[in-house]
Amino acid sequence: MSFIPVAEDSDFPIQNLPYGVFSTQSNPKPRIGVAIGDQILDLSVIKHLFTGPVLSKHQHVFDETTLNSFMGLGQAAWKEARASLQNLLSASQAQLRDDKELRQRAFTSQASATMHLPATIGDYTDFYSSLQHATNVGIMFRGKENALLPNWLHLPVGYHGRASSVVVSGTPIRRPMGQMRPDNSKPPVYGASKRLDMELEMAFFVGPGNRFGEPIPISKAQEHIFGMVLMNDWSARDIQQWEYVPLGPFLGKSFGTTISPWVVPMDALMPFVVPNPKQDPKPLPYLCHSQPYTFDINLSVALKGEGMSQAATICRSNFKHMYWTILQQLTHHSVNGCNLRPGDLLASGTISGSDPESFGSMLELSWKGTKAIDVGQGQTRTFLLDGDEVIITGHCQGDGYRVGFGQCAGKVLPALSPA
């Protein structure tokens, strides 16, 4: 138990301690903090209290404006930091609890803070690792007989996204303009996307990277994974459908990707590990791992339209539905010698279960726009309207506590007028 009061339904008990980057009106410099209850502990203020064998030599990483350097220190530093923080925040420890002057400088209410991206994201890769999602999309566009492409059950399919347009929760997303071909009997047209969608995803940040030309074996992959966030991979389906052959997504995805600001460390998620999904056929040896490494994370998506008094939940899913694990994703990404770096972001792909209510995109929930999605108060949707706010939340449920991720939210702004 912490000396900081934490409600039972708080996302941020002492069992969590996620890392983020924040600023305040009184101190506009972005700095590294840890969430506890409704407070933020400023690590730049208490860096001198990290006196373990690793961090005593690297206290300066907590003076930086991003988590990249801390991410790059590796598991020994992360575990040492977590143990120190849990000790300092414990109700039985006086060092921080009883130092009123230090406490006053070290803690900030989350309500008064502005959150920033937790890391400088050098590269962003999006995978396509939900069997149900891949099957659903395949049925819609290719038919039931050709739902899965031949490679899907053999490797974690992915594509390189646009790191520059990854934004932190709360950043508005402008409806994109682009080229579409709504009528195959007519030439393509240019205009605002009419099929703007959300995608329920999660993502993980890379810790230490690998040298150029040297793959990360799956037995070592866990050592390179710092922590996880929620993600909304906004998608313009009409732009995407016209452009994606033969090289895959481009402008239909690159206009905006939202992540939650708090990075939940993997050690906070390990109590919620569950068996990996059965993979048939068995993957090639470089992708095989026996240790469980997927997680029971309850996920939900809510939509709040303009004029709606409250948001309506349109999807409930779970991260455990993923077919390919994050260890497999990381290893496959590096198998050709591609070098990953601290702060790189690797995303899961849309998270869909077998139940229609667990489908993680409006493309699936509306079945390509043929079914209305009830969002309450007499309103329905097939795709997103201007003014709609999408709010993704997620948590692991423990005994009397929960390890949560906060919110991943964004509101749709109207498209700019064509030039």
UniProtKB/Swiss-Prot annotation:
InterPro entries: Fumarylacetoacetase (IPR005959), Fumarylacetoacetase-like_C (IPR011234), Fumarylacetoacetase_C_sf (IPR036663), Fumarylacetoacetase_N (IPR015377), Fumarylacetoacetase_N_sf (IPR036462). Pfam families: FAA_hydrolase, FAA_hydrolase_N. One of its GO terms (biological process) is homogentisate catabolic process. Ca(2+) binds at residues 126, 199, 201, 233. Belongs to the FAH family. Homodimer. It comes from Rattus norvegicus (Rat). The keyword Hydrolase applies. Signal peptide: none annotated. Mainly in liver and kidney. It comes from the Eukaryota. The keyword Phosphoprotein applies. NCBIfam families: fum_ac_acetase (TIGR01266). Substrate binds at residues 128, 142, 240, 244, 350. This is Fumarylacetoacetase. The modification N-acetylserine is found at residue 2.
